[in-house]
Amino acid sequence: DFLFARTMIGVFKNIEYMCSRTNSKTWGKEAWKKIVVCVVSDGRAKINPRTRAVLAGLGVYQDGIAKQQVNGKDVTAHIYEYTTQIGMELKGNQVHLKPRSGVPVQMIFCLKEKNQKKINSHRWFFQAFGRVLDPNICVLLDAGTKPGRDSIYHLWRAFDLQPMCGGACGEIKAMLSHGKKLINPLIXA
């Protein structure tokens, strides 16, 4: 739940940043309507119960309605969608939900029935949601990765300025607690 929340807080801040770009032809006050946050979880039995509770608190998950079979056929995945106005904050390793003063966030949550690993989750994202949403760009983040407040905008801008660009990546910095230093410089490399 902590790692998931850290990532989502960063994503929410990026959406707010794009909405704050009032002089932009693409972004601005209504930018949140152009952005969909898709969360894919790998296996109903494997998802952390606290992460599931955070998703329920955001309004994008309902506990107890998922079934393994419908009309005698195995279910592959459970899909939930919601436009949330709930935010999060971290206090230590605790996740606290709170009303968002910022912009709404459109979310889709795909809870795969079986754990089929990360590459299968990526396939789900591109084949299932990519076809329906028809996005200009996609940004993939693992839970625990905290994007800077404008980093997703800069990734988008790289694609916007170079339409023939097929991929881009951002810089990842190690998050250290205040006052901590790495003693072994090889670990930092």
UniProtKB/Swiss-Prot annotation:
Record keywords: Cell membrane, Cell wall biogenesis/degradation, Glycosyltransferase, Membrane, Transferase, Transmembrane
EC number: 2.4.1.16
Recorded GO MF terms: chitin synthase activity
Keyword Ribonucleoprotein: no
Source organism, top-level taxon: Eukaryota
GO CC aspect terms: cell septum; plasma membrane
Membrane-related topology note: Multi-pass membrane protein
Catalytic reactions of this protein: [(1->4)-N-acetyl-beta-D-glucosaminyl](n) + UDP-N-acetyl-alpha-D-glucosamine = [(1->4)-N-acetyl-beta-D-glucosaminyl](n+1) + UDP + H(+)
Family of this protein: Belongs to the chitin synthase family. Class I subfamily.
Gene: CHS1
Originating organism: Ajellomyces capsulatus
Role according to the record: Polymerizes chitin, a structural polymer of the cell wall and septum, by transferring the sugar moiety of UDP-GlcNAc to the non-reducing end of the growing chitin polymer.
Protein name in UniProt: Chitin synthase 1
Lineage: Eukaryota, Fungi, Dikarya, Ascomycota, Pezizomycotina
A single BP term in Gene Ontology: cell wall organization
Pfam families (alphabetical): Chitin_synth_1
Cystine pairings recorded for this chain: none
